[in-house]
Amino acid sequence: MVHDGNLYAAGILRTETGENYNKGVDGVTPLIAGVTTPEQTQRLLAHLTSQQELFTPVGISTVDQSAGYYYDNGYWNGSVWLPYQYFLWKSMLDLGYGEFAEKIAKTALHAWSQETDFSYNTFELIQIESERGGWFHQFSGLSSPLVVWYHSYYKPGNVTVGFDTWLEEWHFSNDYSSARIRYKTSRVGGLLLAVMNEEYSDYSVTIDGEPAQFVQRIPGTLEIRLSQWQGEVIVQAK
C-alpha cells in the first residue's frame, strides 16, 4: 500500500513495471481474518487454489508463481511454510470448503513425510523447485501443524473446527462408534471434523435432533456442516 503525505492510503504498491507487489500469501490473509465479502472470497480462493499461482505440489507458496518477482529457490520467496498452511486450512473449515481444507492438510503431510523419510529431519520450510526441506534441520516448532492435521483426519476421538467455532464439550463411546458434541459458532455453514471408528461404513448425524449434512472423504472421518449458531451434534454408527 502506498500512502500520501497525510499517511492516508493512496493506492497499491507496485513494481516499476506496474505489477502488484502483494501477489503472495499475505494477500489472501483477509480470508483468515474472516472479513471478505462473498465476491472477495471467491476471487481470493481462485488465486489460492490455482496451480499456476499459489498452490504447488508441496503446498501453498508464499509468493504467486506467476508474479514477475517470483524466485523458485529462495528462503521466503519460492518456499512453503507450514504455519501459513495451518492458518488457511482452519479458515477453509470456517468457510465450509472441506475438500480444499483436506487437500491442504494431505499435501503438507505428504511433503513433510517425503522429506523426513529421506533425511529424518524437520526443516524450516519446503522448497518448491526441489520439493526438499531447507535451512535449519531441527526446526521442531513447525511440526506442530503436522500433528494437528494427522489427528484431525486420522485419530479416532478427535474433533476439529475452524477459528470461528467454539467446542463446549465432546464425548465418544469407547469404540468411537458414537459421539456427542456441543458447539457455538459465529459462522453458520462452517465445518466440524469428527474422527470415528472407520470399521463402521455408515453413520447418522443430527444437530439438535434434525438430520445434518455431512460427508466422509476419509473412512471414519466425518465432515459435518454446522447449520445453526449453536447446538448438540449426535453421531451414531448404523
Where are these regions (language model features)?
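C-terminal capping/lid segments that line or modulate ligand- or cofactor-binding pockets
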Residues: L7-Q51, G74-S178, T185
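Short, isolated positions in well-ordered beta-strands
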Residues: E168, A212-Q213
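Surface-exposed beta-strand/loop patches in extracellular or lumenal glycoproteins
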Residues: K184-S201
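C-terminal beta-strand-rich structural cap/linker in extracellular carbohydrate-active enzymes
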Residues: L191, Q216-K238
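Short strand-turn-strand beta-turns centered on an Asx-Gly dipeptide
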Residues: T206-E210
